[in-house]
């Protein structure tokens, strides 16, 4: 039974502590849109998305009004387009036409972003998947709200180094194609290892082939709430600290569960999962970095940062999992540098480095996220960063990802501005020692020994 104190507490979370639902994401299966004719495929995709998602935005807004819970984004994910377009796309330009169809459909229904311009190449690339990857510079520079991801490895299959090597060049080309807006195209692309099928967050969201025809997934966001709760834990031991985070995560997730069930009921589409992730914004007081500093670090990146993040991540999961019937997606703490005020400050001061962020990715939700690097960083260095991160995911049986932005024309110490939720970031130094001979060997890195469970 709810008591009046808990009601006031939830109101306070929303009004003062920046609790919000980061996204209601509708996943839509497009396998029934496959045809051998490009224009037919584009029309089928447009019609299905605009039919299924026509009420998504208005439903989200009505839930906001009825419950007083801010819902920041409404998004769509679709079946990886490399699969959908394989029959009709004979060139990279053909895939770009599908990207335009996705962009038009998403704008018609009024969502913020659409994800799923994706390829799953954890073992090897088909010709269609390679065409889609090569189409990315044009697709991401010519569209506004289409997001893309490529899964380059998994614990079961190893890492496809051919696609990793290719992506280094592609990311450079995306950066060049959007050089006039601080290489913003790279913000809409992420390379994954062990990508989940039900991720509601961008840029890595896609509607996996294991999913049904349509589904509602919800991502919550509450670092500000956790930060405020930790004020009461100052000077207390780890048991009290963990209990505080756990209880707070439960309350945050309960809000997400309510929104997910209500959206599912109103739209007539099954509820999929709640993603438990703590997703920051560039606003003051809405920072995962601030939470880590309240745990006891002078600044993010100090010794102890990885341990503090591991503990935070675990307690968020332990608290959140009891509050939802289905948990999935990425579920943990996000550490996107440009989207987190305290991390931006730590990166600027030099306390937070890419190497430290890589260590942090071993214990948190995703990987090297929203990191601006010098525009003259070589393609092989970017491939090496992706390979390192994929190896962490592969060996530790977790999702890892890389979203780096080589900002054309800028170097260490300058600032890149991406705007809105994407924030701004100092250009961070990258180790310039060459790994070209390694990433150009060709072939794949085998799956680790502990992946053989049968």
Curated annotation (Swiss-Prot):
PANTHER family to which the protein is assigned, alphabetical: UPF0210 PROTEIN MJ1665, UPF0210 PROTEIN SPR0218
Subunit structure: Homodimer.
SS bonds (residue pairs): none
Pfam name, any one: DUF711
Protein name, UniProt field: UPF0210 protein BLA_0552
Protein family membership: Belongs to the UPF0210 family.
Domain of life per record: Bacteria
């Amino acid at each position: 039974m709810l008591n009046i104190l808990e009601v006031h507490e939830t109101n306070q979370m929303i009004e003062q502590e920046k609790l919000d639902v980061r996204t209601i994401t509708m996943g839509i299966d497009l396998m029934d849109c496959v045809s051998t004719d490009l224009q037919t495929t584009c029309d089928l995709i447009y019609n299905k998305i605009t039919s299924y998602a026509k009420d998504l935005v208005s439903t989200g807004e009505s839930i906001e009004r009825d419950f007083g819970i801010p819902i920041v984004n409404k998004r769509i994910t679709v079946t990886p387009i490399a699969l959908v377009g394989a029959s009709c796309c004979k060139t990279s330009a053909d895939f770009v036409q599908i990207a335009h169809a996705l962009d038009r459909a998403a704008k018609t229904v009024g969502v913020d972003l659409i994800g799923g311009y994706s390829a799953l190449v954890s073992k090897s690339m088909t010709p269609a998947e390679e065409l889609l990857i090569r189409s990315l510079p044009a697709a991401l520079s010519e569209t506004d709200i289409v997001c893309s991801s490529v899964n380059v490895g998994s614990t079961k299959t190893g890492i496809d180094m051919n696609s990793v090597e290719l992506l280094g060049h592609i990311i450079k080309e995306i950066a060049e194609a959007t050089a006039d807006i601080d290489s913003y195209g790279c913000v809409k692309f992420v390379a994954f290892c062990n990508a989940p099928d039900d991720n509601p967050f961008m840029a890595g969201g896609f509607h996996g082939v294991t999913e049904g025809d349509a589904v509602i997934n919800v991502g919550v966001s509450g670092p500000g709430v956790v930060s405020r709760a930790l004020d009461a834990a100052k000077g207390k031991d780890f048991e009290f600290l963990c209990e505080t985070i756990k209880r707070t995560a439960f309350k945050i997730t309960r809000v997400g569960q309510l929104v997910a069930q209500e959206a599912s009921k109103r739209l007539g589409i099954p509820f999929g999962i709640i993603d438990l992730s703590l997703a920051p914004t560039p606003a003051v007081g809405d920072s995962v970095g601030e939470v880590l500093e309240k745990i006891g670090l002078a600044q993010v990146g100090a010794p102890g940062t990885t341990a503090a993040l591991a503990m935070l991540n675990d307690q968020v999961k332990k608290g959140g999992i009891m509050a939802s019937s289905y948990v999935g997606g990425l579920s943990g703490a996000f550490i996107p540098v440009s989207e987190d005020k305290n991390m931006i400050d730590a990166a600027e001061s030099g306390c937070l480095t890419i190497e430290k962020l890589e260590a942090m990715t071993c214990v948190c939700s995703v990987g090297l996220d929203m990191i601006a690097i010098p525009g003259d960083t070589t393609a092989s260095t970017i491939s090496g960063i992706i390979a390192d991160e994929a190896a962490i995911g592969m060996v530790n049986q977790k999702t890892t990802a890389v979203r780096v932005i080589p900002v054309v024309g800028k170097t260490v110490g300058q600032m890149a501005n991406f705007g809105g939720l994407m924030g701004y970031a100092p250009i961070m130094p990258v180790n310039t020692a060459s790994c070209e001979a390694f990433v150009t060997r060709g072939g794949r890195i085998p799956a680790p020994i502990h992946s053989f469970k049968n």
